A protein has these predicted regions:
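Mature-chain termini and adjacent capping regions
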Residues: 1-131
Length: 131
């Protein structure tokens, strides 16, 4: 079995055109990483949850907290089946040593492989050392 996933919201509204979809407000989600006994916490103002495949889209004021890492952005797509988090739009990554700004961060929750990139190949990811 893989990771465990819990989604909480202050409000939820079922999509009448597709009852598998629930629109969420004031969302908090937890991804419990089985292999490492660690937790990724995701919060956002809004969410769109698929009750069949558990895929969730988070939007507006998205925050990821994982160990000493903090990532903020405006849009996050989480696929439990693919074990993939993709956060985009005004992405800022902070840890104890660096602040990084990019267009997109992709994180595989199983392998921890991370891709950080810009949409425009002529632009560069901005990295600043805190120390």
């Amino acid at each position: 079995r893989g990771n465990k996933y819990t989604v909480l919201a202050k409000e939820g509204e079922i999509d009448l055109s597709n009852t598998d979809i629930i629109f969420l407000k004031d969302v908090t989600a937890y991804i419990y990483l089985k292999k490492r006994m660690e937790t990724i916490t995701i919060t956002s103002n809004f969410g769109k949850y698929n009750s069949i495949n558990f895929d969730t889209i988070f939007s507006k004021n998205v925050i990821i907290d994982y160990l000493d890492n903090n990532i903020t952005g405006e849009y996050l797509d989480y696929s439990m089946k693919k074990n993939l988090i993709i956060i985009s739009r005004n992405v800022v990554y902070k840890n104890l040593e660096n602040i990084l700004k990019a267009d997109v961060i992709e994180l595989n929750t199983t392998t921890k492989d991370t891709k950080i990139f810009m949409y425009n190949s002529t632009k560069k990811v901005n990295i600043k050392s805190i120390n």
